[in-house]
Every structure is written in structure tokens, then in C-alpha cells.
């Protein structure tokens, strides 16, 4: 099919966003962990290495839950009550400052 938003690849080129900052903020729907904390059912959890973090906030933008927040010093942190351990943040981090480690029970 090779379409985007009902347009062919060539027609869609002008609407493809080049920067993370160009993407719109998405609202949080009622089915998220905002109203349903995950608790501790994760298998893996993300851990931030501040020495590698460049404060680009890509992890924060891509996190599907309200689990990543920005601390007063500008670094990101994980609120494990809301993190479901999906690993999107670690996968999107350009400097690999976030690693997924086995959850200890």
C-alpha cells in the first residue's frame, strides 16, 4: 500500500516531521497508568545514567505513560509507580543513557 495519511509516499514527504520537537503533544487517555498505577508487575525497568544523558527529552516525549519526569536539575527520572517497563525510552535514547535491567522482587 505504501501510504501515509491516505497519501502516497511522494505526496506525504512534505508532512513527515524531521524533528522530535515538531511532533504534537498527545493527551493522556483514561486507560493509561495515570489513573491505573502499574505497581511492580514489570519484568524489566529502565535506569537512567546521568553521565550519558544529554537532556534531549526524547525519552520523555516517547514514553506512552506519565512515567518519565524532568527533575529540577534538568535530568530525567522514572516514576516506577507508573512505568510498565515497555523499554521505549531505552530504545529511543540516542546516547543509550537508559538501560533496561531485570526487576528485582
UniProtKB/Swiss-Prot annotation:
The keyword Metal-binding applies. [4Fe-4S] cluster 2 binds at residues 63, 83, 86, 89. InterPro entries: 4Fe4S_Fe-S-bd (IPR017896), 4Fe4S_Fe_S_CS (IPR017900), PorD_KorD (IPR011898). Its cofactor is [4Fe-4S] cluster. Residues 44-73, 74-103 form the 4Fe-4S ferredoxin-type domain. Pfam families: Fer4_21. Keywords: 4Fe-4S, Electron transport, Iron, Iron-sulfur, Metal-binding, Oxidoreductase, Repeat, Transport. It catalyses: 3-methyl-2-oxobutanoate + 2 oxidized [2Fe-2S]-[ferredoxin] + CoA = 2-methylpropanoyl-CoA + 2 reduced [2Fe-2S]-[ferredoxin] + CO2 + H(+). Binds 2 [4Fe-4S] clusters. Its EC number is 1.2.7.7. One of its GO terms (molecular function) is metal ion binding. PROSITE patterns: 4FE4S_FER_1, 4FE4S_FER_2. [4Fe-4S] cluster 1 binds at residues 53, 56, 59, 93. Heterotetramer of one alpha, one beta, one delta and one gamma chain. This is Ketoisovalerate oxidoreductase subunit VorD. It comes from Pyrococcus furiosus (strain ATCC 43587 / DSM 3638 / JCM 8422 / Vc1). The gene is vorD.
